[in-house]
Structure formats: structure tokens, C-alpha cells
Amino acid sequence: MSSQSLHDCLRGRCLGVLRRMEIIGRFRYYFQHPWSRLLVSYLVTFFNFLIFAEDPVSHSQKEAHMSVVGNCFSFIISKYPAGFWSVLKVLLWVLAIICGLIAGKFIFHRRLFGRVLRLKMFREDHGSWMTMFFSTILSLFIFSHIYNLLLLMSVRMRPYMVTEYMGIRNESFMKMAAVGTWMGDFVTAWMVTDMMLQDTHYPDWGRTARHLWRQGHNRIVLFWTVLICLTSVVVLVISTDWIRWDNLNRGFLPSDEVSRAFLASFILVFDLLIVMQDWEFPHFMGDLDMNLPGLSTTQLKIRLPVCKRIFKEEYHIHITGKWFNYGIIFLVLILDLNMWKNQIFYKPYEYGQYVGPGEKIYTVEDPDTLQDFNRSMLTWEWRSTNIDPRTNQTFNQSNAI
């Protein structure tokens, strides 16, 4: 009797394990199905355009600021003093880049990820360039503070201190970010499309499309044609304000801080889902090494000749398709995180804006006047009752909705 009970117990456990495996298998089948992956990748592109159009920060005339990345931008691009200090600044950020690359390659990638954590996705040299990129950002951030400490030696150098403020307006920065996210999202979506049409994990899906896609150079011609045409249109529309979303929308789907915060959160989740839906996630150990977008090769190899008397070898830059495309996703993720932060902690007065009747957000379009306004002056009550002496009209009449 006890033997029969033990047999039934083991049988029940085996059936339970098989049932769980069946559920997991079904979930993965639909979660990683080509239609699911295509839907997520193209929805990210659409949502990024939507949040750029709805985000009031994209109309702000105040100086753009961004944690960490803003310091790096200010350190390399803007706020250059004259004479010796300018040379010192260049030397420091060049040294920061070199230190960041070395630390990323040998400390973070090889020692931390490879030997200590033993992460399979970072085996050999896989993912080293992405690791080196993020370690370089960290290095630039640290060296920018070292540069600030040196500037404290002179009182006249205080205006040149490196901060998170980037020296450009939010309107200009958001346009550049929109173009950057478009490029990253499109290349990623096209990478997913390319992978779906090249692989055979789902042999019954899209047979006709796969047949046409694999003929000759169809995929390469289509990639560059669509990329150049759509990017030209996107850059034209974003940079010239030829199409204004507020004029098209006309309050049909008005948004507020909560809805924009949820939209930004969905974008972040979808960015991660694109990587998680990969058939080789999380180790990326499969034999399939997909072609780079717009190219007929799975990897880029660049030979760097060095002094053979010292190193006795040549160095090779090797970028595989997987890390090239998913590396782009993580770059876009930086901009999406900044967008998410703006929506979560949005305060109109910090961006030269205020709330008017009907919960509409008004933007002060003259950036020079923002220096003279404090928080109490950036309200509808004050701006609708005070006269601008330059125009002899109330301040709110010169502001954009």
C-alpha cells in the first residue's frame, strides 16, 4: 500500500512538472512569437513620437538639464573658458575617455562580468563595446567633478563650472532626442523584422514574405530606402515645426502628468521587452548570429595596426549583430529614462511654463525674460493681470499654449 502511495505521489509530481513545463512552453511560444515581437518593437516607435508630441517640456525655452549625461555633454561640448583652462579641460576629458575605455574593458567586462559574476552574455569579448561606452560616461562624470575642483582655484572661473545644465534650450534638446530615439527605434524595429524574416523558429509564419525577403539584395535595398526616406521626413517635420501636434490633435486626446508618466513607463517596459523577447535571452548563446541592419554580414571587423615592436600583434574591433542592435536599445533607454524622469517630476515653473484655464499649459517663448521671472510670476493670475511694457499687452498674450 505504501509502495502504491509512493508511486502515485511521484506520478503526481511528474505530471505537475510536465504541466508547468507545458505552461511555460506555451507562454514562451506566444511571448516570442513574430507578431508579438513586431507589435512591441513598432509600438515603441509610435509611443516615442506620441510622448514627444504631448510632452510640454519639448516646448520649453529654458536651459536643458540631464543628470550625469548633462555633465558629460557640458564637459565636452560647452562652457569652454579661455587660455590655459580650455587646454586643461580638453586634456581632462580626453584622459577621462581613455580611462573609461580601459576600465570598461578590463575591470567591468573582463573581471567583473566575466570572472566574478560569470555572465554568459559577456563571454569572451561579447558586449565589451557597450560596457566600455557606459564606463566612459561614468569616467567623464567623475573627471568633470575633478575639473570643477580645479576651477575653484580661481573665482573668475565659477561661471565655467560643469553642471547638468547643457547650454542648449529644452526645445532644441528634445528635438535632437526625438531624432535620436527615432533612429534607434527604427533600427531596432527593423532588426526584429529582419530576424523574423530570416529565421525558421516559426516555420509556418510569413512564408511568402520570407521568400521575397531572402531573394537577392531585397532586404538591404529596402532597409536603406526606407531609412533614408523616413528619416528625411522625420527630421524635416521635427526640426521645422511644419506639423504642430496641438493643431492636429485639438484636444481630442488631452494628456496630463499621470497619463504621460504611464506612457513613459510603457516605453521603458517595451524597451526591455524587445531584449527579453529574443529567442536566446538571457545568455545569447545560440548559433544564430544575425546580419547587421542594411548589411550582408553578421559582424564588422576593423583591423587596428599598432606598434609591433611593443605589442607584437594587431588589434581587431569586432561588432556582432546582436550586440550592435541591442546596444542601440540601451542608448535609447538613456533618453527614455530622462523622458520618464521629466514626466514623473514635472513642475511647470521649472521649465518656464504655467497652467492656465482648462488645465492648459502655457509656455513663455522669450528665453531672455525668464531670467527676470520668479516662481510667483509664472502663474496665470500674475501674467493675465500684469502689462508687458515692451508690447503694452498682458504677459500671457505673448505665450504659446
Curated annotation (Swiss-Prot):
It is a multi-pass membrane protein. One of its GO terms (cellular component) is plasma membrane. The keyword Transmembrane helix applies. The chain crosses the membrane at residues 38-58, 82-102, 132-152, 177-197, 220-240, 261-281, 317-337. Pfam families: TMEM117. Residues 1-37, 103-131, 198-219, 282-316 are cytoplasmic. Signal peptide: none annotated. It is found in: Cell membrane. GO terms for biological process: intrinsic apoptotic signaling pathway in response to endoplasmic reticulum stress. Residues 59-81, 153-176, 241-260, 338-401 are extracellular. Keywords: Cell membrane, Glycoprotein, Membrane, Transmembrane, Transmembrane helix. Glycans are attached at residues 170, 374, 392, 396. The keyword Lyase does not apply. PANTHER family: TRANSMEMBRANE PROTEIN 117. May be involved in endoplasmic reticulum (ER) stress-induced cell death pathway. Belongs to the TMEM117 family. This is Transmembrane protein 117. It comes from Danio rerio (Zebrafish). The lineage of its organism: Eukaryota, Metazoa, Chordata, Craniata, Vertebrata.
